[in-house]
Amino acid sequence: MVGRLYRVLSCTEYLEGKRHPAPALKLTLYNVIGERILEDQRVPIDTGYEGSIMLTSELYQAFQIAELPRTLWRNYRTLTGAITMRMARGIVEIDDMRFECFVESPLFGKGKLLIGRELLNRLTIVMDGKRKQSCIGRLEPGNNPKKFNP
């Protein structure tokens, strides 16, 4: 049997949902000139969203100073059709980690506040549905077994 041991660094309570609680992570978000735009905000996790962080149109305005050229904006396919997303650089802080990421907001429409797979794939996360918590973890040193190949 192959296993790994992780140390939990912090946990965030799930958000209340219409039918079911929603996994979330607590983050602080800065624009590239260092202005704090969100502080210790619980943001829903959406594994169906491929980008890093989606923002409402209102929040996105604080990031327009570092907006990427339109040729680099992304298009996503949804059930209702293609959506063009404006993109800018931002800085996210989750627990003791701080790194640059992309923030996006729909060119048309209001947008939502979401954490997507591009950011999630940079983290070790346990979504503990029974306890209704999303936890950030770190692999214990010297505890990285080789992949299991039967």
Go through each PLM region and give its residues.
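Pepsin/retropepsin-fold aspartyl endopeptidases
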Residues: M1-P150
